[in-house]
Amino acid sequence: MSDTSESGAGLTRFQAEASEKDSSSMMQTLLTVTQNVEVPETLKASKALEVSEDVKVSKASGVSKATEVSKTPEAQEAPATQASSTTQLTDTQVLATENKSVAADTKKQNADPQAVTMPATETKKVSHVADTKVNTKAQETEAAPSQASADEPEPESAAAQSQENQDTRPKVKAKKARKVKHLDGEEDGSSDQSQASGTTGGRRVSKALMASMARRASRGPIAFWARRASRTRLAAWARRALLSLRSPKARRGKARRRAAKLQSSQEPEAPPPRDVALLQGRANDLVKYLLAKDQTKIPIKRSDMLKDIIKEYTDVYPEIIERAGYSLEKVFGIQLKEIDKNDHLYILLSTLEPTDAGILGTTKDSPKLGLLMVLLSIIFMNGNRSSEAVIWEVLRKLGLRPGIHHSLFGDVKKLITDEFVKQKYLDYARVPNSNPPEYEFFWGLRSYYETSKMKVLKFACKVQKKDPKEWAAQYREAMEADLKAAAEAAAEAKARAEIRARMGIGLGSENAAGPCNWDEADIGPWAKARIQAGAEAKAKAQESGSASTGASTSTNNSASASASTSGGFSAGASLTATLTFGLFAGLGGAGASTSGSSGACGFSYK
């Protein structure tokens, strides 16, 4: 019993000394490990205290268990050995941890001082609790000596187990500490730099994550093209460096070649050689085609010319059309005129035979053209438009009614609403929002080129035996239209002359295809009469030497040639004059009566 009491007293003294000597160092060590190793995700004091308390209580319990099983002097030395080894391992681990967490310690200096000092005070409290528990265990050991003696074979195994636990616990602790350091410690340590690196949705980005993102971005397509661009720039720099090492003679030769290439690119390319004879042959065929198509007075489409005559030579069709127009002017005294730039419609205009109406030629359709002059006069005197009701009101006074066949005009309604409209002499359109539908008549595109407002006004005033100036509004409008038409004609003639000079037309190339026998061509009697009239006009102009005399002679000769071509033409001309003046004479006589009324066309009729 006395031995037991002595051993218990010795054990108590040993525990007291160990607790006095090692408690301060162990607590400081544990405090350092707690601060450096077990750093929480955020600096929360409560979590830090819980971790430190668990670690220290486990340490204290391990020490007390070691003292319970040690009865012999060897067992008494075991706690000291265990404590020393544990202290050494802990110190080593602490040093390793301190070396790894230098950045975390430096970043923590700006943290809240209260959050840093709280673990120390709490650790002191835990140390007192651990001492109290150790003393309590010692008293329990004194009270139960029989149990200690009964378990006598176990001390060595227990001591070995405790030693093994003490040896392995720091390693596991260090491994866990490294994991925590990697996962949470760096994030918490870099909290001060999280604002500089940026946050996403409240989540801090660690240095490791930023490094991995940088490595991943360096392998992306953007980085690939950036590296390729840098290599390209490097290659260009190297090429320039190599070029700079060339001899001055080589550099001068390259400069000359570059200048020659630049000059050749700036100079206009020479046009490929053209087969003028072939082009002129196609132009002559086009002249025949135009003369035949114009007999119907329907405008000729450019698409028809390309399809029927020009065919595979579409790349040079402008020159072929221009050569055909030049031949028409020089041989026939006819101008090829494009009246619609959108639909590309062409007509033939006379340049040798001016008449009072200005309408092309003297043909078998002269009576119809006389009726057309009446319609154009009514439309112009009404303000460039006239309703269908007014037109028929005037024609009824002249004995022309819709649906009744006329000996000269046939179906009058079809003539004025279909044939004249197709020939582009008139436009026939419905009045918007009219119920029942009503229609109006306007001048067509062809009428603006074959005649003029001034000629129509003079024609109407001649019938009425009035001066054109008495119709002030119409006279002013006609004068403005004539000035505008003259300016457009001058500009068009200048542009045509430039185009022909560039194409080499009019320099004798029209004879490249050989003489063309127009008399044998299937161009109709009217075209042949125009050829004869043109030839006679040229001969008379050369003989007289005067432009005015030549113009009057060509007019008389063309009229005589047209009359001698066929008896039907002369009869048609006289019929046109009789019809035209007879119609307006009737209108004038009707206007002389007192019971007559003034119509919308400006003429007086019953």
Curated annotation (Swiss-Prot):
Keyword terms, alphabetized: Acetylation, Phosphoprotein, Tumor antigen
Superkingdom as given in the UniProt entry: Eukaryota
Phosphoprotein listed as a keyword: yes
Domain MAGE, chain residue ranges per copy: 279-478
Gene3D superfamilies, per database record: MAGE homology domain, winged helix WH1 motif, MAGE homology domain, winged helix WH2 motif
Biased composition (Low complexity): 142-164
Source species taxonomy: Eukaryota, Metazoa, Chordata, Craniata, Vertebrata
Encoding gene, per UniProt annotation: MAGED2
An example Gene Ontology biological process: renal sodium ion absorption
Bias (Basic and acidic residues): 122-131
Residue numbers bearing the Phosphoserine modification: S5, S157, S190, S191, S194, S197, S244, S247, S264, S265
GO cellular component terms given for this protein: cytosol; nucleolus; nucleoplasm
Protein name: Melanoma-associated antigen D2
